[in-house]
Curated annotation (Swiss-Prot):
Source species of the chain: Kineococcus radiotolerans (strain ATCC BAA-149 / DSM 14245 / SRS30216)
GO MF annotation: an example: structural constituent of ribosome
Keyword Ribonucleoprotein: yes
GO biological process, one term: translation
CDD domains named in the record: Ribosomal_L30 (cd01658)
Name listed for the protein in its UniProt record: Large ribosomal subunit protein uL30
Keywords carried by this UniProt record: Ribonucleoprotein, Ribosomal protein
SUBUNIT field: Part of the 50S ribosomal subunit.
Length: 60
């Protein structure tokens, strides 16, 4: 299964509550922080919600 590296590039301050909560559920707390997760539909949906706040890379 593919894995994705998600890095927070913008702050959640001033964003809608669901976007802030999505960042937290992804495990992102600070700008520049990265997490590696399995590529699942649930995860993709969370990334799409905050796509303007994160970057996504595929990791082997």
């Amino acid at each position: 299964m593919a894995r994705l590296k998600v890095t927070q590039i913008n702050s959640g301050i001033g964003r809608k509550q669901n976007q802030r909560e999505t960042l937290r559920s992804l495990g992102l707390h600070k700008i520049g922080q990265s997490v590696v997760k399995d590529d699942k539909p649930e995860f993709r949906g969370m990334v799409n919600t905050v796509s303007h706040l994160v970057t996504v890379e595929e990791v082997d």
